[in-house]
Curated annotation (Swiss-Prot):
A Pfam family per the record: AraC_binding
Superkingdom field: Bacteria
One BP term from GO: rhamnose metabolic process
Cellular component terms per the entry's GO annotation: cytoplasm
Span of domain HTH araC/xylS-type: 174-272
Protein name: HTH-type transcriptional activator RhaS
Source organism: Escherichia coli O139:H28 (strain E24377A / ETEC)
Function as written in the Swiss-Prot or TrEMBL entry: Activates expression of the rhaBAD and rhaT operons.
Keyword Transcription listed: yes
Length: 278
């Protein structure tokens, strides 16, 4: 597995924060690093496989990656990221207690993926731009300023994620996308879903396509297929059982969609013919 080292990314040995844009981010194999990072998805779509679990990411997704996590990007489509790198929560010169603002693992569950709306994403970009402007400065005031900006970024992300509400359609769409991650195997009636999230059906279709690049049903199918591929690689369940568990009522239809999406059959994936290393 590829290991990325801080010496290749941080501008100096005493720098606590670094900005690493990926515009765009191509498919990238599984790796980990000796530093932490906050991945901010600017726009585009892709699959982020985080510690073996697949997540669909789009503009407004924020991922918190620790130094012992492993992850990869695949199935990317104009995926543009900004990575905010930091050595460790306790490696700041002027800040303490940052770990309390970061996602906390509870009972083995780590909430690594958050979502923010478009207006928050704009504020995030402004903070990141200010950090970038000061990257070449190593004096104490500049170091303190960068660390304060990093603290502001964490506060903004935490507050925005905790207070995601139904005030506007963009926030409601974010909640809908999070709901789909948890209910991908359910029978989805888009009229009922639109009503549940106080969106008109037309608005749901338009905004979801703007956000993900595909229609709602195509997005749902892709989500189901990603979950199915994960189960094919990491479980002993039959192809038919996996199809049903991921929301497909017809295993033949599932196999057709699967091959169309990945250019491999479910059996190929089960046998490791796609070259994936378990």
């Amino acid at each position: 597995m590829t290991v990325l080292h801080s010496v290749d990314f941080f501008p100096s040995g005493n720098a606590s924060v670094a900005i690493e844009p990926r515009l765009p981010q191509a498919d990238f194999p599984e790796h980990h690093h000796d530093f932490h990072e906050i991945v901010i998805v600017e726009h585009g779509t892709g699959i982020h496989v985080f510690n073996g679990q697949p997540y669909t990411i789009t503009g407004g997704t924020v991922c918190f990656v620790r130094d012992h996590d492993r992850h990869l990007y695949e199935h990317t489509d104009n995926l543009c990221l900004t990575n905010v790198l930091y050595r460790s929560p306790d490696r700041f010169q002027f800040l303490a207690g940052l770990n309390q603002l970061l996602p906390q693992e509870l009972d083995g569950q780590y909430p690594s993926h958050w979502r923010v709306n478009h207006s928050v994403l704009q504020q995030v970009r402004q903070l990141v731009a200010q950090m970038e402007q000061q990257e070449g400065e190593n004096d104490l005031p500049s170091t303190a300023s960068r660390e304060i900006l990093f603290m502001q970024l964490l506060l903004l992300l935490r507050k925005s994620s905790l207070q995601e509400n139904l005030e506007n359609s963009a926030s409601r769409l974010n909640l809908l996308l999070a709901w789909l991650e948890d209910h991908f195997a359910d029978e989805v009636n888009w009229d009922a879903v639109a009503e549940q999230f106080s969106l008109s059906l037309r608005t749901l279709h338009r905004q979801l396509k703007q956000q993900t690049g595909v229609t709602p049903q195509r997005y749902l199918n892709r989500l189901r297929l990603m979950k199915a591929r994960h189960l094919l690689r990491h479980s002993e369940a039959s192809v038919t059982d996996i199809a049903y568990r991921c929301g497909f009522s017809d295993s033949n239809h599932f196999s057709t969609l699967f091959r169309r999406e990945f250019n491999w059959s479910p059996r190929d994936i089960r046998q490791g013919r796609d070259g994936f290393l378990q």
